[in-house]
Amino acid sequence: MYFTLILENESGEQVNLSTTANQYMTSKIEGLNSPAGTVSTSSYAGMNGSYLNNAFIEKRNVVISFAMRGIGIEKRRHQLYQVVKPSRYIKIWYKTANIDVYAEGYVETCEVSNFEQQISGQISILCPDIYWYSRDIFYAYYSGVTGAFHFPFPESDAPFPLGVYATNDTFSIVNDGDETGFTLRIEALPSDIPQEVVAVTPTIYNENGEYLQIKGDILTGDVITVTTKTGSKTVTLTRNGVDSNILNRLVSGSTWLTLKEGTNIFRVEAVRGVKKLRVTLMHRNSYLGV
């Protein structure tokens, strides 16, 4: 199977480990499949069977085995060391004919045999975030007003629309990967009145009735960014170019919504001014195994 494998450090420097006749011959990549789960159970007293305490996946371990070919091996070995440094951040880009993904982790070891006739090596990378993520970002939009202005510009005196109010306060997005969090961007539509309160307490509902609600006023020019991804859940308000943490405005009972596999439908509501909001949902497909 043909594949592309590139390692990139936090400075953006890359080393291409894709199989070539005179560079690297990657013989094995471990850690592409789903990581092993940890399952904890306890026995019933005097009864058959047991009950589940918890089950989770701790981390992903990607191990790359390779050989070095051609001339200039020592130079390429030092180039490898420059990019792949133990304990440092690394991004793994992996691409086949059907998938283009990346994972992020930290280098555990980078070992190369220096004194053998056939130069070989192995790189071990630990990924606290267990998922592979698609290179592409996918978007879904909701807007209370949809632009209707177009060219050529009408020349008659008859009225023509500049915008159309939405009659449906829902939007949908397809998730082709595993269940994952997402980033939600809530913006107030432009207004001629500076610092006008355009909306109050927006709420996002999923199909199951679970919701994420942020109390308070949204002023002209405000942008609220919500991230529901495990390990980086945040609620941030950008006002007049200044970011501030507004996690305390998340209403009790709210759920950190996620994208289930397949089609997801969301509904936008607000105490006031829902038609003056623009909502953008962004996510990358995530995969336990590729």
Regions found by a protein language model. Name each.
Residues 1-41:
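Polar/acidic, low-complexity leader/linker segments enriched in S/T/G and N/D
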Residues 27-61:
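Short, solvent-exposed beta-alpha or beta-beta edge segments that form flexible loop/patches at the rim
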Residues 47-71, 117-130, 264:
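Oligomerization/assembly interface segments of phage tail-like spikes and tubes
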Residues 56-58, 84-86, 97, 115-119, ...:
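Solvent-exposed loop and beta-edge segments used for protein-protein assembly and interaction
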Residues 56-57, 61-91, 98:
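Compositionally biased, low-complexity regions
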Residues 89, 93-134:
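Short beta-strand and beta-hairpin "edge-sheet" elements
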Residues 133-141:
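Short, charged, solvent-exposed linker or helix-capping segments at domain edges/interfaces
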Residues 142-290:
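Intrinsically disordered, low-complexity segments enriched in serine, threonine, and glycine
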